[in-house]
Amino acid sequence: MTLLELTVVILVLLTLITVLFFGAQAWKRGSDRALCIIHIHNVQKGMRSYSNLYGFSPGANAPNLQSQIIGLGRVIETTPTCPGGGNYTFGQTYGVDTVPPMGTLYMECSLSSSFQHLPNVTPDW
């Protein structure tokens, strides 16, 4: 094999490795986004279940709502963490102890705008 052929083979291999890294990075971002949305959905379900069980209507004040949903022996055992490195905030729009109206998220991710860690459709949530 000549030096030129060897150089071409190395360049092709490096190009393929580069494409592989970009693909893996895109896959990781997508899986982080999906898991983040699952966390948001689970907390939303837990909040709705708690409010239905104890008779809190949307917009009502539910004392210690976050600690009633998340914790040992609760609907969600541990506080979720965003796999993409974002931070979750609870009750950002209506308050931590207020049951939000239907279609409004109780927990939001700080990466919702930059990495789209936000569900596309939430009217029934």
Residue ranges and their predicted role:
Residues 4, 38, 84:
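Single, functionally critical "micro-switch" positions that shape active/binding sites
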Residues 17-68:
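Conserved hydrophobic/amphipathic alpha-helical signal-anchor segments
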Residues 14, 20, 43, 80-83, ...:
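Short linear sequence motifs
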Residues 49-125:
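Periplasmic/extracellular, small/polar-rich flexible segments of pilin-like filament-forming proteins
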Residues 1-24:
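N-terminal single-pass transmembrane signal-anchor helix
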